Swiss-Prot record:
Coiled coil: none annotated. It comes from Gallus gallus. Pfam families: RPE65 (PF03055). Retinal pigment epithelium specific. It catalyses: an all-trans-retinyl ester + H2O = 11-cis-retinol + a fatty acid + H(+); lutein = (3R,3'S)-zeaxanthin; all-trans-retinyl hexadecanoate + H2O = 11-cis-retinol + hexadecanoate + H(+). GO terms for cellular component: endoplasmic reticulum membrane; membrane; plasma membrane. This is Retinoid isomerohydrolase. Binds 1 Fe(2+) ion per subunit. Keywords: Cell membrane, Cytoplasm, Endoplasmic reticulum, Hydrolase, Iron, Isomerase, Lipid metabolism, Lipoprotein, Membrane, Metal-binding, Microsome, Palmitate, Phosphoprotein, Sensory transduction, Vision. The gene is RPE65. The modification Phosphoserine is found at S117. Fe cation binds at H180, H241, H313, H527. Belongs to the carotenoid oxygenase family.
Length: 533
């Protein structure tokens, strides 16, 4: 999958430039042929405003949320985008400065306030951002843009207008929730967030939002906690970006990247800090994996352990003959990868980008296998009996199960990230294919298809072109897992008057089917979905 492609021209810097929203959709110029069955909207979130006046944002996850939409209808494509009217955005525009602290940018107090009003404002509590720049997902008939705090933002998926802010704390006991919920085919939504558990210790709650019922009541009102995972460190919860779900089990991976809660509360309130200032790494804990029975809400009393890694994205999780297979996009070691995602690093010249990436944790896609039943008589033995994997699970004398992975992709400073699968049919089930964004020293420069069984890869790549997360859209009459197309927004700043386009690939061989070009730059986007018409 990887090749030594260089980017000396630095076209990737266009990914991190401020753009204006559009007053109305623009028509894209199509080359190739859009499949007639492809009808609906590609919705994506990302940062679109990287400074407010003279005040810059510093981290990749700080820019103000911009919602994008490509509409497909009868072979034609239009593009639209609007800023999400979050409190963070509206107040910044009103006061012409950064008002709410973001992931890596501290919001300084209003200089017009006197010292006493600024002092007392510190004790009103932490003002959490609602900057919904990470993902968009459905709940019932509604759609929400989200980040990773307790605030999500209801949006209109047709007009991209902002409807209202929603505080998850008013419905369930969580301090925040991930931007990667699982949405089942019946509309049930599962997510995870940290919370205060027993004896004021931190814990992690799995929340369930039911599908829309006949009474048409907002499903958010029926949200509930279905299981609680304990925290390995009383006051330092791990950073959680995603989790695994199968028909019968929930998998939570607790990594050594920790949030120092005391530092979060004291530093933030008293002398000013941002979210990044409150992360630290536990260099000795490694990784703990927790499993719960989904329907009974009961924790499995098995202690799974492995060596340290960062984790942001689960590829897929499934059950097979008494085992859970957990496929992950990992980054080796305990150092936090986000330390390398400051905009100054990402906007640097190519040689400096490579230099910084050489210091960062090494990416690797891995398969872990977790036995669901253990026998003390098997101490010292590998418990994995599945014939198709080299992953091992060894029962130790302290009754922990030590896991060693099977590597399904690894390349020097080349990551297989932002993974997508045929989720509707194969999410939580045995599968063969995953699609990912290829990161070359953190620069996205290819789209990849990976056969997780054979490790065969297919790649789309063009010079000085920078794609986004691939979104798989299944053919409505699909007979095979990879019958469909892959959608990605590509930035190609050196290609003339049309610097960006929506790329459509054949999901079987990653060959180009069509592209829809627009005459505006499109900054980096993180995640999204395809909403069928």
């Amino acid at each position: 999958m990887y090749s030594q492609v260089e980017h000396p021209a630095g076209g990737y810097k266009k990914l991190f430039e401020t753009v204006e929203e559009l007053s109305s959709p623009v028509t894209a110029h199509v080359t190739g042929r859009i499949p007639t069955w492809l009808r609906g909207s590609l919705l994506r979130c990302g940062p679109g405003l990287f400074e407010v006046g003279a005040e810059p944002f510093y981290h990749l996850f700080d820019g103000q949320a911009l919602l994008h939409k490509f509409d497909f209808k009868e072979g034609h494509v239009t593009y639209h985008r609007r800023f999400v009217r979050t409190d963070a955005y509206v107040r910044a525009m009103t006061e012409k400065r950064i008002v709410i602290t973001e992931f890596g940018t501290y919001a300084y107090p209003d200089p017009c306030k006197n010292i006493f009003s600024r002092f007392f404002s510190y004790f009103k509590g932490v003002e959490v951002t609602d900057n919904a720049l990470v993902n968009v997902y459905p709940v019932g008939e509604d759609y929400y843009a989200c980040t990773e705090t307790n605030f999500i933002t209801k949006i209109n998926p047709d007009t991209l207008e902002t409807i209202k802010q929603v505080d998850l704390c008013k419905y369930v006991s969580v301090n925040g929730a991930t931007a990667h919920p699982h949405v089942e085919n019946d509309g049930t939504v599962y997510n995870i967030g940290n919370c205060f558990g027993k004896n004021f210790s931190l814990a992690y709650n799995i929340i369930r939002i039911p599908p829309l019922q006949a009474d048409k009541e907002d499903p958010m009102n029926k949200s509930e906690v279905v299981v609680q995972f304990p925290c390995s460190d009383r006051f330092k919860p791990s950073y959680v970006h995603s989790f695994g779900l199968t028909p019968n089990y929930i998998v939570f991976v607790e990594t050594p990247v920790k949030i120092n809660l005391l530092k979060f509360l004291s530093s933030w309130s008293l002398w000013g800090a941002n979210y990044m200032d409150c992360f630290e790494s536990n260099e000795t804990m490694g990784v703990w994996l927790h499993v719960a029975e989904k329907k009974k809400g009961r924790l499995l009393n098995i202690k799974y352990r492995t060596s340290a890694f960062n984790l942001f994205h689960h590829i897929n999780t499934f059950e097979d003959n008494g085992f859970l297979i957990v496929d992950l996009c990992t980054w080796k070691g305990f150092e936090f990868v986000y330390n390398y995602l400051y905009l100054a690093n990402l906007r640097a010249n190519w040689d400096e980008v490579k230099k910084q990436a050489e210091k960062a944790p090494q990416p690797e896609a891995r398969r872990y296998v977790l036995p669901l039943r253990i026998d003390k008589a098997d101490t010292g033995k590998n418990l994995v009996t599945l014939p198709y994997t080299t992953a091992t699970a060894t029962l130790r004398s302290d009754e922990t199960v030590w896991l060693e992975p099977e590597v399904i992709f690894s390349g020097p400073r080349h990551a297989f990230e932002f993974p997508q699968i045929n989720y509707k049919k194969y999410g939580g089930k045995p599968y063969t294919y995953t699609y990912g964004l290829g990161l070359n020293h953190f620069v996205p420069d290819r789209l990849c298809k990976l056969n997780v069984k054979t490790k065969e890869t297919w790649v789309w790549q063009e010079p000085d072109s920078y794609p986004s997360e691939p979104i798989f859209v299944s053919h409505p009459d699909a007979l095979e897992e990879d019958d469909g197309v892959v959608l990605s927004i590509v930035i190609s700043p050196g290609s003339g008057p049309k610097p960006a386009y929506l790329l459509i690939l054949n999901a079987k061989d990653m060959s180009e089917v069509a592209r829809a070009e627009v005459e505006v730059n499109i900054p980096v986007t993180f995640h999204g979905l395809f909403k069928r018409a």
